[in-house]
Regions:
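Short, conserved SAM-binding/catalytic segment
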Residues: 1-2
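A conserved structural/catalytic subdomain of Rossmann-like adenosyl-cofactor enzymes
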Residues: 7, 12-196
């Protein structure tokens, strides 16, 4: 893999403004309040709503969406609050993303997974083309997985997901997408739900 790593500012100096990626994986910093959002109110990346100047979470989401190719897929980690916050238009942005049929799956993770923060996290999976023929047609549905009770404590302040926990989450998502080798998907009360 060829690459170049350089210090930069993703929001204010996008080094790849025309990039359209087939796959995006990201772990952006959670809940950044000093990201200069007030200087980007009219940014073309904010197609689903202007993110609040005091929290960059939905700026990251929309930056990722902006760079997805027509059949692109993204997976990223954000603070758990991104699934429910309604402050400063965040709820409207989230609703617009769902109505645009971009949100494929949301996974609520247990707290204490990260050594750098105690903030609970979640996984977002987005897909531009949810009827692409490779998997079942998932248009109009979102898979919700509640993995908050998974993973043992490895010490007083940290939790880790086991290989079995990770496989359970992944297999649930793959089965829901219609991947034959993952088996048949079924809702499991308290763990997963496919919702229209």
């Amino acid at each position: 893999i060829d690459g170049q790593i350089a210090h930069g500012d993703t929001f204010h100096d996008d080094r790849h403004p025309d990039l359209k990626a087939d796959f995006i994986l990201a772990n952006p910093p959670f809940n950044i309040s000093d990201w200069g959002g007030e200087r980007l109110r009219d940014d073309p990346r904010w197609k689903y709503g202007v993110p609040p100047a005091g929290n960059a979470n939905f700026a990251w989401v929309q930056h990722i969406v902006h760079h997805l190719a027509p059949a692109g897929v993204a997976g990223f980690v954000l603070a758990n609050g991104s699934m429910s916050s309604n402050q400063s238009g965040e709820g409207e942005i989230r609703r617009n993303l769902i109505e645009a049929d971009l949100v494929d799956c949301m996974v609520a993770l247990p707290g204490q997974l990260f050594y750098s923060t105690q903030i609970p996290a979640c996984l977002w999976f987005l897909a531009r083309d949810r009827k692409n023929g490779k998997f079942r047609d998932r248009r109009g549905h979102v898979l919700f997985i509640d993995a908050r009770k998974l993973g043992p404590l490895v010490d007083r302040t940290h939790r880790e997901l086991t290989d079995e926990d990770i496989a359970r989450i992944a297999n649930t998502y793959h089965a829901w997408r219609g991947e034959k080798e993952a088996g048949e998907y079924a809702d499991v009360p308290g763990f997963c739900k496919s919702a229209p």
